């Protein structure tokens, strides 16, 4: 109530301001191209400390992000892997890398190991024989190592005389042998070699066939066995003088 009465009763007069043209003419308001207007603004900005601090913080942030984005110079390439050892030599432990060298990544190390050539197979390494090399190739059986009177040739045979099998003569071979036996029951070494080459048989086979054929011929003709007769004659001739013809001693 007191304030309203004061305002009503007081002799208050509204102030009257000159127009804007007078302010501009009397330099109350600076013009748009006035140099003092910009200078005052610069002084006002430099005197405001919080804005300056914010500017430094932004500069640090920009520098920090720039440092994160810049990767810098690329790292040097990793050293090449050592060459594989020659075949036949025992592999040695790899030498440690030098102090200044950078170790490659695990993926690069695996690629370097897989790129090394595989060891040569046993057939390409004749200078260094090994048990695996001998196991790769089967033993070779040459013609002179084969035996005709043996039924099968075993390349893995260790030793010892195998059991001989019965030789099966063909009809043509038996016919030629019977012809030769009809003309001559005993052969010379030269004739035996000729017949063996002609019939594709060995000398031993020709010799055994003629022995068996002579025994059969003697049996067919009922001739005495010369081997048994010669053995008995030798025994009777070697007896003591008191026993003539190998008889019992007289009492």
Curated annotation (Swiss-Prot):
It comes from Homo sapiens. The keyword Cell membrane does not apply. GO terms for cellular component: centrosome; chromatin; nucleoplasm. Residues 1-12 have a biased composition (Polar residues). Residues 162-221 bind DNA. Residues 1-134, 220-251 are annotated as: Disordered. This is Homeobox protein Hox-B4. Belongs to the Antp homeobox family. Deformed subfamily. It is found in: Nucleus. A motif (Antp-type hexapeptide) lies at residues 141-146. Sequence-specific transcription factor which is part of a developmental regulatory system that provides cells with specific positional identities on the anterior-posterior axis. The modification Phosphoserine is found at residue 90. It comes from the Eukaryota. Residues 71-99 have a biased composition (Pro residues). InterPro entries: Antp_homeobox_Deformed_sf, HD, HD_metazoa, Homeobox_antennapedia, Homeobox_Antennapedia_CS, Homeobox_CS, Homeodomain-like_sf. Keywords: Developmental protein, DNA-binding, Homeobox, Nucleus, Phosphoprotein, Transcription, Transcription regulation. PANTHER family: HOMEOBOX PROTEIN HOX-B4, HOMEOTIC PROTEIN DEFORMED. Its main location: nucleus. One of its GO terms (biological process) is embryonic skeletal system morphogenesis. GO terms for molecular function: DNA-binding transcription factor activity, RNA polymerase II-specific; RNA polymerase II cis-regulatory region sequence-specific DNA binding; sequence-specific double-stranded DNA binding. The gene is HOXB4. It holds the Pfam family Homeodomain.
């Amino acid at each position: 109530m007191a304030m309203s009465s004061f305002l009503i009763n007081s002799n208050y007069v509204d102030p009257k301001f000159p127009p804007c043209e007078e302010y501009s003419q009397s330099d109350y308001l600076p013009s748009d191209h006035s140099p003092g207007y910009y200078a005052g603004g610069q002084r006002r900005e430099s005197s405001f400390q919080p804005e300056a601090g914010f500017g430094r913080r932004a500069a640090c942030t920009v520098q920090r992000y720039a440092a994160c984005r810049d990767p810098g110079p690329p790292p040097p390439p990793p050293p090449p892997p050592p060459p594989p050892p020659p075949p036949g030599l025992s592999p040695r432990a790899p030498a440690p890398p030098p102090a200044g060298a950078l170790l490659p990544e695990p993926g690069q190390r695996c690629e370097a190991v897989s790129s090394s050539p595989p060891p040569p197979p046993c057939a390409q390494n004749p200078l260094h024989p090994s048990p695996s090399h001998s196991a790769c190739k089967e033993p070779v059986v040459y013609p002179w190592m084969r035996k005709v009177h043996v039924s099968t040739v075993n390349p893995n045979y260790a030793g010892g005389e195998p059991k001989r099998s019965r030789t099966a003569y063909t009809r043509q071979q038996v016919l030629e042998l019977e012809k030769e036996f009809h003309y001559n029951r005993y052969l010379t070494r030269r004739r035996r070699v000729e017949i063996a080459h002609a019939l594709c048989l060995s000398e031993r086979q020709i010799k055994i066939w003629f022995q068996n054929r002579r025994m059969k011929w003697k049996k067919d003709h009922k001739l005495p066995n010369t081997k048994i007769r010669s053995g008995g004659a030798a025994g009777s001739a070697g007896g003591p003088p008191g026993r003539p013809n190998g008889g019992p001693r007289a009492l």
